[in-house]
Amino acid sequence: MRPPRRQASALLLVLWALILLSGAVFAYAKWIQADIQLHGQVNREIEAGAMCHSGMALALHELVTKETEGLDEDFAPDLGFRIRMVSEGGKLNISLLIQGEQPERLDILKKWLEGRGLDYKERESFVDCLLDFVDGDDVKHLNGVEDDTDYQPPNRPLESIDEIEQVANSGPLARSPGWKDDLTMFSTGLDLNAANEDVLRLLGISEPYIVRFLQTRRGRDGVDGTPDDQLLADMKIVGAYLGLNEVRLKSLQGFITLKDPTLRIISEGRSGNVTRQVEVVARKGGATPQILLWKE
């Protein structure tokens, strides 16, 4: 018969073996769980990306508009996409505002800068510096800056809204929260069917005319971008609503429009707790949309 001490030692060895085996099994189980979670997360990211791009493909179709149903689609409780489409024509096209240095357009720009908190001196300085930034010569505007020791404007058209921050004396504007949201470089003109109250005021339109025009344009629900909107297609009729006579309309020709085809489209795809977003600026109006910006 085996001595008790040897039996105890054997039992301890068995217990240690069981403990080690249990630890190994537990570690393996945790590794498997982590691997499953990792692959699950990867799958979520793939699904969210697929939803996002599916939504964008739908939005870019020539027949799809802001009023089209199905722009917010759920395929499962945690799987789907949401599309937002906003007219880029409701913003101020900075390139058109400074093109040709037309006094009436520069006046609109200066009014906007005033609303952004810039005083007279800051407005005059920034506008002249902006003109020096984009013109094709080294002749300085009255309040502008051309070649200096540590500043050389490129003397070419703007390439992006962000580039405005490189213009001399742009600091006061850059410190104004959300200023970039008011500007665009992609529209074909200021779309009066998309412009809000603040933008319409920049054209020198009085408040009663703005109120009446927006009530008509927005329809019974008082909201832009809904099926009951009444978008006007005749510039003379719009001019009458806004109190703009023929002379004033002619002075704004080439800057205002009634149907800008440029849209900023944001498609957000979701899968579980993962979301993916694509932002596109596109000009629609034919079978193949013109992509002006694609950002993921």
Model segments located where?
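Compositionally biased linear targeting/interaction segments
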Residues: 2, 9-296
